[in-house]
Amino acid sequence: MTNIRKSHPLIKIINDSFIDLPAPSNISAWWNFGSLLGICLALQILTGLFLAMHYTSDTTTAFSSVTHICRDVNYGWVLRYLHANGASMFFICLYLHVGRGLYYGSYLFKETWNMGVILLFAVMATAFMGYVLPWGQMSFWGATVITNLLSAIPYIGTNLVEWIWGGFSVDKATLTRFFAFHFLLPFIISALVMVHLLFLHETGSNNPTGIPSNVDMIPFHPYYTIKDILGLFMMILILLSLVLFSPDMLGDPDNYMPANPLNTPPHIKPEWYFLFAYAILRSIPNKLGGVLALVLSILILIIIPFLHTSKQRSMTFRPISQCLFWLLAADLLTLTWIGGQPVEHPYVIIGQLASILYFLIIIAIMPLAGLMENHLLKW
């Protein structure tokens, strides 16, 4: 009798994706983040579902409903802080996952990579709308500033912004629709994740050497299931440490003040995981230019496969490209720091230089380094 694991139409799909999946024998801990992202998504959907049972998306009661969750609902504070800090863990894993793809040349699986970029945009949109829901000061002003950026679009900009707002300012209609979309998008993301995995399993995983590993594959279970569980425990340890010891460390104190359209906070800034893009936006004095730079800072990932000039796939054996990669990582950390600082000297000029460097490294310096390494290796 055939094993049900291999014959049942549904269980067979799970088996081929997570149990008998052939995986390269040499993939490192950098390949753990895909499964961690899946767990983060499941955690966010679960905690979000329970929070939605107690939350009200009305401008008069939204802030107090979040307070009610924290004070009166059984373990409501755990749910709220798991959800808020779970988003931070989600983005840490996301950025490390993208960084791994850049370093090891995984972007040459174009369909998987492009699907990943779409997923990144979807997760960013979801996180932005989620930040608006507690209806604190930073929620309200963040929503106002970011949605207002669309008014930079020529001709239709103003109409588009008012259409998104559902009125002439961020108000009840905006909050209600943001809640609806924030609830819906994670399920769309789940579907996109399945497409992402479908494309990945068409080609199989890349590995640290960048050399095809068809000759040396091992089953995903038990080797990588146990490895992923170790990564999961480490992530849960960090997440629970955040939630139980310093739940507000990554948040903004201004969000503990109810939204007030008549009082602008001194420094409007998004959550830490958007600061690098916010710094790029602010570094350009022109509104439309800033918006374009903001969108391109993420959209540039789409063209990375076409900028690959090296004869080698991975950066493992390319020291010049490695130095540039870590320079890019340092540059992104600098941009993240600048995004949280006020718009004054010397932060403005540092932000502008870091923004120029970001685009220069990706568009020009890295492709040139690839060509140079080919020449050095007499290829």
From Swiss-Prot:
Principal localization reads: mitochondrion
Q: Name one GO molecular function term.
A: ubiquinol-cytochrome-c reductase activity
Q: Where does this protein hold a ubiquinone?
A: H201
Keyword terms:
Electron transport, Heme, Iron, Membrane, Metal-binding, Mitochondrion, Mitochondrion inner membrane, Respiratory chain, Transmembrane, Transmembrane helix, Transport, Ubiquinone
Cofactor dependence is on: heme b
Report the transmembrane regions from the record. 33-53, 77-98, 113-133, 178-198, 226-246, 288-308, 320-340, 347-367
GO annotation terms (biological process): mitochondrial electron transport, ubiquinol to cytochrome c
Assigned GO CC terms: mitochondrial inner membrane; respiratory chain complex III
Which residues of this UniProt protein bind heme b b562?
Answer: H83, H182
**Belongs to which family?**
Belongs to the cytochrome b family.
Describe the task this protein carries out.
Component of the ubiquinol-cytochrome c reductase complex (complex III or cytochrome b-c1 complex) that is part of the mitochondrial respiratory chain. The b-c1 complex mediates electron transfer from ubiquinol to cytochrome c. Contributes to the generation of a proton gradient across the mitochondrial membrane that is then used for ATP synthesis.
What is the protein name for this chain? Cytochrome b
Lineage here is:
Eukaryota, Metazoa, Chordata, Craniata, Vertebrata
